[in-house]
Amino acid sequence: TLSLHDALPISKVPKGQGYLPAFWLMANDENVYGQWPRCGEIDCMEVMGQETNKAYGTIHYGNPHSESQGTYTIKDGADFSDDFHTFTCDWEPGKITWYVDGVKYHEESDWYSTTVGQGTLTYPAPFDQPFYIILNLAVGGSWVGNPNDETSFENNPYEIDYVRVYQKDSYNEDVKRPPKEVTLRDPDAKGNY
C-alpha cells in the first residue's frame, strides 16, 4: 500500500504499433471517492509503442473525467526501447512531479474530486488516500491502436530492471489548493479590458 512516496522503476519498453507499457497507480479503495475517475489515477509512465521517443505522465480525476498530462521527448534520436531509463513519480501532499532519467518534465498541484451526492470535494482529494502500483503492458486500444503487420511479438519485451519505492519520514500535510493565476489582457485604445 502506498500513500506518499517517490517511486522509481528502471525499464526498457517494447517497440511497435499497439504496445502501451505503463507504470501507474490506482486507489486501494474506490469506495472512498467513487469509481474511476473520481478515485484518481496517477500514470507515472506511459510510452506508446509506435512513438517510443516520448513518455507521458498524467493524472486522472474528478467527474466528469478530467486529466492533466505532461510529455517528455528523449533527445538525440534515441528512444525508450534502446536502453534502460528511470521513470520517477514523486508524490507529496498537494504536488506530483514526474522525471525521466533525473530530469523534471512535469508537475501538477491542482485537481479535485467529486462523490455522488456530495458535489465537489476539497483539494487534495482524491490524491490523499493509499494507492497501489501497477506495471503492465497493454496491447491494443483506442489510444495506441491495434498491432499491425510490422508489430513484432518476438524478442520485444517490456523489461523492468527494478522498482524502488521510498517514503519520507514526514510531510507537510497542511496543503492548500494553489491560487488560480489571473491574466488580464492589455487594455484597448479606450482603456477597456
Task: Show where each model-derived region lies.
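GH16 jelly-roll
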Residues: 3-193
